[in-house]
A protein has these predicted regions:
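Basic/polar phosphate-binding segments, predominantly the helix-turn-helix DNA-binding elements
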Residues: 42-71, 94-119
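Non-catalytic, surface-exposed connector residues within folded enzymatic/regulatory domains
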Residues: 19-22, 70
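Terminal helix-turn-helix DNA-binding modules in bacterial transcription factors
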Residues: 26-34, 61-102, 122-129
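C-terminal alpha-helix/helix-terminus motif
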Residues: 11, 15, 113, 117, ...
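Basic, amphipathic alpha-helical hairpins
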Residues: 8-20, 27-40, 47, 58-63, ...
Length: 129
């Protein structure tokens, strides 16, 4: 009976640990999305009280990507949505995503999607017609 109780306690501890890890994952990834324009790994670790190493591993284990690659992917996805769903200028979209200048946004967007933001918007509008 004592062995069963210890086993049950261990299982409950493992369960709560896993739940806690999943919550950490969710909170960190949500924070990145909400602060995509300015977020840094240092800021995340300070905000949650986690070490840089823990934050980095959490992001990598959850997304399969390092922080910078994940941030870039999120920025591009958000840029795609803004290009399709708003009439905001490419310059204002670039700034809202935290790019220092429009040229950098255009270059990275083209590298990731194969077309410029303007081409992407135009093609998306044609596909909707």
């Amino acid at each position: 009976a004592d062995t069963m109780r210890r086993f049950q306690d261990t299982m409950e501890s493992s369960y709560f640990f896993m739940q806690s890890r999943q919550l950490d994952d969710f909170l960190v990834l949500n924070y990145i999305q909400e602060h995509i324009d300015t977020v840094t790994l240092t800021e995340i670790s300070k905000h949650f009280g986690f070490s840089l190493s823990y934050c980095s591993k959490l992001i990598k284990n959850t997304t399969g990507m390092g922080f910078n690659d994940w941030k870039k992917a999120l920025r591009i996805r958000k840029g795609e949505r803004l290009l399709v769903n708003t009439t905001d200028t490419i310059s204002s979209i670039s700034l809202s995503l935290g790019y220092e200048n429009t040229e950098t946004f255009i270059r990275i967007f083209k590298k990731e999607t194969g077309m410029t933001p303007g081409q992407y918007r135009k093609q998306s509008q044609q596909n909707l017609q």
